[in-house]
Amino acid sequence: KTQKGKFPIKSDIHATVKAIQDTGINVHANYMFGFQDDTIETMQQTLDLALDLNTEFVQMRYVNVLPGAPMYNDFTEDQLPKDWNAYSQYSYEAQPLDTKYISGKEVLKFRDHAFQTYFRSQKYLDLVKNKFGKKCYDHMLIQPKVPLKRKLLEEQKVA
């Protein structure tokens, strides 16, 4: 069964990331939102960890269940996206699955919030400026200002 990763002792992951960074290696971390047991609170814990670790590169994604994946059979056909565009993380049609506790819409909204929060955090921007220079820093000031358009997050217009 696929589940959210858990580190037995919080300091282990912190010490590991620091040890890697201390050797001059840039860390690329991947964070997933929308596991079946996720709530807004558990996703916030994941974001808090990301902000605390402050790695050089991150991906913030929602859980996607593709045909052939072990988790795919845990869902009924009506729970899965009907169109391949819905599987694309950054597409207008992106459609995360509901968790046991929150809707796919809430997962997508949180994922996009997490992305904006991380890349706008001063701690991260300082890391970029100090490690990669002003040109990269200036780019990072612009990049998160372009929000993704999401069909699922558009307000429904009342006739």
At which residue positions do the language-model features occur?
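C-terminal non-catalytic accessory extensions
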Residues: D138-A159
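A structural motif corresponding to the C-terminal lobe/cap of the Radical SAM core domain
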Residues: K1-K135, V158
